[in-house]
Regions:
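Conserved nucleotide-sugar phosphate-binding/catalytic loop shared by glycosyltransferases and other
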Residues: 6-73
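A nucleotide-sugar donor-handling region in carbohydrate enzymes
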Residues: 121-198
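C-terminal amphipathic helix plus adjacent low-complexity
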Residues: 300-330
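Donor-nucleotide binding loops and adjacent catalytic segments primarily
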Residues: 2-7, 168, 173-244
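A donor-sugar binding/catalytic signature common to diverse glycosyltransferases
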Residues: 90-97, 102, 112, 234-278
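Conserved nucleotide-sugar donor-interacting segment of glycosyltransferase catalytic cores
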Residues: 79-135
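Short, polar loop motifs at secondary-structure junctions
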Residues: 18-24, 94-98, 147-152, 195-198, ...
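Nucleotide-sugar donor-binding patch of glycosyltransferase catalytic domains
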Residues: 128, 229, 263-302
Length: 330
């Protein structure tokens, strides 16, 4: 999205606040715009506690994390207000609640861009009264550009505009280059992205496939698997070069798989949170994915590689144009 905003508006500058672990990636990806981009660290204290051994959420630990985070939000918002640079024309968030409190206080447009908010997620672990401060912060947003695979009506932002799906642009020549390098005759090439929470050494993988995988995964012995370099800024092209995608239920990779027209396997957690449940529900409606448990990974077969029946459009430029219009750029 940042790339699309900067491409569409040559006069635009961005102050991009993101997790310290994302700063290097953001700098590399946006390197042709660095004269117009300021990168600064931001750490959200919200955390879903995941039980790796059982591939499920630890509800008690997550509840503690949510309550601690909500208690700290007012002070965090004050700190963000102090850090707000001069000359800002809009605050965009995906989907940090403090951003909207800061925008409201500064008299700026507060624009959300997401398929969910942390309010719906927190509601799965805490009572309505406990998360009311979170609702109040989100209600200060002026607008949500609401992606598909959404938690929908449960989102506490009143003004919503459907935004479809977006991802970074695909590059056909780069996709062909990756496929020539890794695709072997008579073998399916699978994009594997399940984060660091799943121990594949313990669970195993189907040896009938070859894999391109992202960091945080330890593939078991006897599997042909190639690590995508951690510094790669075009993982969407690696995904598009593969014959199918195996991923946990995260929005970005699911959206990329749908937009790249790839057969999709979604690995479910044992007790999914609100965003995961919303994504799975919509994928079921579309018949766009095969749902699997982590333990089924060694048993996948090529017969399950069903082509996508629906076609999706990358709305990245449209969403960027809507943001720029709200920010007063034409």
């Amino acid at each position: 999205m940042s790339e699309a905003l900067l491409d569409l508006q040559p006069e635009l500058g961005l102050v991009l606040r993101c997790h310290p672990g994302q700063l290097e990636f953001a700098g590399n990806y946006l390197r042709r715009f660095l004269a117009r981009v300021e990168l600064t660290p931001f750490v959200s204290q919200f955390q879903i506690a995941f039980d790796e051994a059982n591939w499920c959420i630890d509800n008690a630990l997550t509840r503690q994390s949510v309550l601690r985070w909500i208690a700290e939000l007012p002070q965090t918002a004050v700190g963000e207000q102090v850090r707000l640079p001069a000359g800002i024309r809009a605050v965009i968030s995906d989907i940090v609640p403090e951003a909207f409190a800061v925008a409201k206080q500064a008299g700026l447009p507060g624009i959300g861009v997401s398929n969910y908010t942390w309010y719906e997620v927190a509601a799965g672990f805490c009572g309505p009264g406990e998360i009311e401060p979170l609702r109040t912060m989100y209600e200060q947003a002026d607008l949500l550009l609401n992606y598909e695979l959404s938690t929908g009506a449960a989102i506490p932002i009143r003004s919503k505009i459907p935004a479809g799906l977006i991802c970074r642009p695909f590059n056909d020549s780069r996709i062909a280059e990756i496929r020539i390098r890794y695709k072997q005759p008579e073998r399916s090439l699978i994009f594997l992205s399940v984060g660091g929470a799943l121990s594949l050494e313990r669970i195993g993988l189907c040896a009938d496939f070859d894999y391109l995988y992202t960091r945080g995964i330890n593939p078991p012995a006897g599997i042909t698997a190639h690590l995508i370099a951690p510094e790669a800024t075009d993982t969407q092209n690696y995904l598009a070069a593969c014959d199918a995608v195996i991923t946990k239920c995260g929005w970005s990779t699911v959206a990329e798989a749908l937009l790249a027209d790839k057969p999709l396997f979604v690995v479910k957690s044992a007790n999914g949170w609100a965003e995961e449940q919303a994504i799975l529900s919509r994928l079921r409606d579309w018949r766009a994915a095969v749902e699997i448990e982590a333990g089924q990974l060694p048993c996948l077969n090529c017969q399950a590689l069903v082509p996508q029946q629906l076609r999706f459009e990358n709305n990245c430029k449209t969403v960027a144009s809507q943001i720029l219009q709200r920010a007063g750029f034409g």
